[in-house]
């Protein structure tokens, strides 16, 4: 009976740590889940950022890319040392989306409410590319 109980506890701990290793190494794609909706005149981007405050999140335009960065500040981190399992993300996240060179940061509107970053990006008029021809001899 006692031996069986010890084996069950050992199996529980092994499963717990195996699950932790698997989740921490392979589940990063669950971070910053994003939905992008297209409407007639704009795009709506919704990004999950649970646990982040407004001052933790930065949105920028870099060479045609919309860049979203989030970093948990030290104020948000729990300082308890006896965690059995810790799944809430702490640290730095960065994600980028290519928009093109015609966008201005001033045109993009955003808000962060209840762990959701919501961005509104107005569409730019697509100009047909001018064709250039080589003169043949």
Curated annotation (Swiss-Prot):
InterPro entries tied to this protein: A-crystallin/Hsp20_dom, HSP20-like_chaperone, Small_HSP
Recorded superkingdom: Bacteria
Coiled-coil portions: none
PROSITE patterns, per database record: SHSP (PS01031)
Pfam families: HSP20 (PF00011)
Start and end residues of each sHSP domain: 25-137
Keywords on record: Chaperone
Keyword DNA damage annotated: no
Keyword Methyltransferase among record annotations: no
Protein family according to the UniProt entry: Belongs to the small heat shock protein (HSP20) family.
Its job: Probable chaperone.
Protein name: Probable Hsp20 family chaperone
Species, as recorded: Onion yellows phytoplasma (strain OY-M)
Lineage: Bacteria, Bacillati, Mycoplasmatota, Mollicutes, Acholeplasmatales
């Amino acid at each position: 009976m006692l031996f069986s109980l010890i084996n069950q506890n050992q199996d529980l701990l092994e499963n717990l740590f195996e699950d932790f290793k698997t989740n921490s190494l392979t589940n990063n794609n669950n971070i910053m889940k994003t939905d992008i909706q297209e409407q007639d005149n704009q795009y709506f981007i919704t990004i999950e950022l649970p646990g982040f405050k407004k001052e933790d999140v930065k949105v920028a335009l870099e060479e045609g890319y919309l860049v979203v960065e989030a970093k948990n500040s030290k104020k948000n981190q729990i300082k308890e040392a006896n965690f059995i399992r810790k799944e809430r993300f702490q640290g730095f996240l960065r994600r980028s989306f290519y928009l093109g060179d015609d966008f201005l940061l001033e045109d993009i509107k955003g808000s962060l409410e209840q762990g959701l970053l919501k961005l509104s990006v107005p569409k730019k008029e697509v100009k047909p590319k001018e064709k250039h021809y080589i003169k043949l001899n």
